[in-house]
């Protein structure tokens, strides 16, 4: 019997976990597969831990790993992928926005021979127009800058064959953007569209700061265009300076005095701001290089509650 691993990162989701686990159990009971439901607790501070332990004691399919600290959604997802042992691995969120009823369709596509089955969100129920527009234009900007095409409306709700999972595990960068990594790997893939539901309960734990950091990771991990933009802006600035110098020289040769204090102040402020912005772009890339060369572990496991887990992995 083939085995399906369902990897679910959670952070302070005590109101959603039990309902989500019941929904998965109902869907998988109708399918001819063994499965594991692997939760990765990303340092939750509510009652998520206790609920996961209770679910694991009552249902052999429910497994859980507890990270030593809040490492972020992408790292928690990576931990789950690293420890999933199924013939296929499905990654999804546990707030019911990724519909469990779509799992049979993903598995069907996998059985047809596709090694990556990527879902694409058509829309999200209850989401503001502003958030829809920012998401839409972010993906357009990302695709314009990046060498890897990221499907607009793409998410981390996907199925991967064991072969693709083993390939993904070889990517160990710290500033992780798994959508980009999966998009760059190749393999035979297909798309399944869906409408994302509203959250079953609670509020999104993805703050504005986390969303901005995630967006920057996506752009900087797969594009050098910001660095090239800095070069082009520098060239234009130099050209502007040469033209301004020629103008002043020409007027001086004509015996005219060029009034320029306000112009000088504006130019200094403008170019000073541009220089700081370009230094910031370079700094972002350098900071990521520093993060990689330290070669620190991506995550630390406080408790591995899977059946037969190697306890020496815990800290």
Sequence positions of predicted segments:
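Short conserved micro-motifs on helix faces and helix-strand junctions that flank
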Residues: 9, 67-69, 158, 231, ...
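Structured catalytic core of nucleotide-sugar glycosyltransferases
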Residues: 1-128
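Hydrophobic helical membrane-anchoring modules
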Residues: 1, 177-315
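Residue-level signature of catalytic and energy-coupling elements of molecular machines
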Residues: 6, 24, 80, 95, ...
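Residues in soluble alpha-helical coiled-coils and helical-bundle/repeat scaffolds
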Residues: 12-15, 97, 101, 169, ...
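Acceptor/aglycone-binding surface of glycosyltransferases and processive sugar-polymer synthases
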Residues: 63-83, 100-181, 197-216
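Conserved amphipathic alpha-helical interaction elements at protein-protein interfaces in regulatory
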Residues: 26, 30, 54, 58, ...
């Amino acid at each position: 019997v083939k085995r399906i691993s369902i990897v679910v990162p959670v952070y302070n989701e005590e109101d959603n976990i039990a309902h989500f686990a019941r929904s998965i159990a109902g869907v998988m009971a109708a399918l001819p597969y063994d499965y594991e439901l692997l939760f990765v607790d990303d340092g939750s501070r509510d009652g998520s831990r206790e609920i996961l332990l209770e679910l694991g004691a009552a249902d052999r399919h429910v497994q859980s790993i507890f990270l030593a600290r809040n490492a972020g959604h992408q790292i928690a997802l990576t931990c789950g992928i690293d420890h999933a042992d199924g013939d296929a691995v499905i990654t999804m969120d546990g707030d019911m926005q990724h519909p469990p009823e779509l799992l049979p369709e993903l598995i069907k596509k996998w059985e047809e021979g596709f090694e990556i089955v990527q879902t694409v969100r058509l829309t999200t129920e209850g989401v503001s127009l502003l958030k829809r527009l920012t998401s839409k234009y972010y993906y357009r900007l990302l695709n314009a800058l990046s060498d890897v095409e990221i499907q607009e409306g793409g998410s981390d709700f996907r199925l991967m064959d064991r072969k693709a999972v083993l390939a993904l595990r070889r990517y160990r960068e710290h500033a992780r953007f798994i959508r980009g990594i999966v998009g760059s790997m190749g393999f035979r893939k297909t798309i399944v569209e869906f409408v994302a539901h509203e959250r079953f309960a609670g509020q999104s734990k993805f703050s504005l700061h986390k969303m901005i950091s995630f967006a920057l990771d996506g752009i900087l991990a797969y594009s050098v265009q910001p660095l090239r933009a800095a070069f082009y802006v520098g060239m234009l600035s130099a050209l502007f300076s040469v033209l301004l110098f020629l103008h002043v020289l020409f007027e001086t040769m004509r015996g005219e005095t060029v009034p320029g204090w306000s112009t000088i102040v504006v130019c200094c402020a403008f170019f000073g701001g541009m220089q700081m912005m370009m230094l910031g772009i370079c700094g972002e890339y350098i900071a990521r290089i520093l993060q990689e060369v330290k070669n620190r572990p991506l995550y630390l496991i406080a408790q591995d509650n899977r059946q037969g887990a190697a306890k020496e992995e815990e800290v």
